[in-house]
Amino acid sequence: MYKKIKLRDQQISELINLESKRQNSQIELIASENYASEDVILANGTSPSNKYGEGYPGKRYYGGCTFIDQIEKIAIERVKKLFKIEYANVQPYSGSSANAAVFAALLKPGDKILGLDLNAGGHLSHGYKINFSGMFYSGISYFLDENELLDYDAIEKIALKTKPNLIICGYSAYSRKIDFARFRQIADKVNAFLLADIAHIAGLIAAGQHPSPVGYAHIITSTTQKTLRGPRGGLILTNSKEIAAKIDKVVFPGIQGGPFFHTIAAKAVAFKEALEPWFKEYCAQIVKNASHFASEFIKKGIRIVSQGTENHLFTIDVLSSYNLNGKQAQILLESVNIITNKNTIPNDTLSPFVTSGLRLGTPAMTSRGFKEQEFSQMAEIIDFVLRKKELNALEIKEIKKKVKILTKNFPIKKSYWP
């Protein structure tokens, strides 16, 4: 899809073109990555990039906001329709910015945040000590059970003991469905706010492929670039008028200045795409592909965290299955043009810079048209590479040839419209 560009800045032009070539020629299995449509990318590089406009539609601190006001209003209305919710803020620059806004709106410094342990699939911004969320707030962790599943009774016990001010559900490497209703019960018992961080599963929720937190979570945050297939950015949703007012005040003037109107325009385009019937079909295929992909490894005797998946991702325990750490596995696969990421697993004994796991996701290659058959091929290739550990020149050449055939047969698409 990506056309060669020619800038007067030849150095940057060449690097952009090399990155486009890399994306076209490699298999992308990082669960948090996707391919935005050409419409989204074009909208993200247009004239609203030049416009400054602190504040909200109709209440800006600058003149000349007639059209950007309309753009932001459209983005808000579309995302509200998409998630069937009353209030939305589309200004956050990222998912972490959205989380920071929620904490600042609802908590005081030192208040307690209860989130999933990072090794078990949580996120840095859910109270981890080296992140702002753990520096300014008191992070407390809950864990998975012996089957590597959420143990709601155990989470409730931790909540009753520690009395958190905010409980977070929503993860970066958890492959099972989340019971938002049960989480709300727990939150209510300790008078805590419930935040659903749906950054990874937002598209699946919008398409009906995962239960929605709307009606259960007091507040919802997300990115827009993962399963929503939009530009890089964040958003905040709620049904509470009171919470919405607090959020708006914190996003601006609390933690951000002028919004990125070019990105808000691109978000609006992505939300329109996500409202189409074919987006539901796409998300259904993501889930089918992930389930099939994981089952192919399980058939080969490979250990998958929680023994499968119900969403778009899963994590292989490469240490016990292949006697490799996650970093080694990632490097090996990249040598044959398959892009993945090392990832911690529950109770990981290795550092986050090495890890025992390898996370795999299906959104990006499903965007290119992969179905179960292609993911069967990927499982065969990945299993072969990781079992071999050291590939000779001929093996590397042969695998790269197979990858090249797949990427040529399934190029990055300009548009997802039928």
UniProtKB/Swiss-Prot annotation:
E.C. number: 2.1.2.1
Entry keyword set: Cytoplasm, One-carbon metabolism, Pyridoxal phosphate, Transferase
Catalytic activity: (6R)-5,10-methylene-5,6,7,8-tetrahydrofolate + glycine + H2O = (6S)-5,6,7,8-tetrahydrofolate + L-serine
Residues annotated for (6S)-5,6,7,8-tetrahydrofolate binding in this entry: 118, 122-124, 351-353
Subcellular location(s) per record: Cytoplasm
Positions of post-translational N6-(pyridoxal phosphate)lysine modification: 226
Organism domain of life: Bacteria
An example molecular function term from Gene Ontology annotations: glycine hydroxymethyltransferase activity
Cofactor(s) annotated in UniProt: pyridoxal 5'-phosphate
Pathway info: One-carbon metabolism; tetrahydrofolate interconversion
One record GO biological process: glycine biosynthetic process from serine
Class in the EC hierarchy, top level: transferase
Cellular component per GO, a single term: cytosol
Pfam family, one: SHMT
Coiled-coil region(s): none
Record note on quaternary structure: Homodimer.
Family in the record: Belongs to the SHMT family.
Physiological role: Catalyzes the reversible interconversion of serine and glycine with tetrahydrofolate (THF) serving as the one-carbon carrier. This reaction serves as the major source of one-carbon groups required for the biosynthesis of purines, thymidylate, methionine, and other important biomolecules.
Protein name (Swiss-Prot/TrEMBL): Probable serine hydroxymethyltransferase
Organism of provenance: Mesomycoplasma hyopneumoniae (strain J / ATCC 25934 / NCTC 10110)
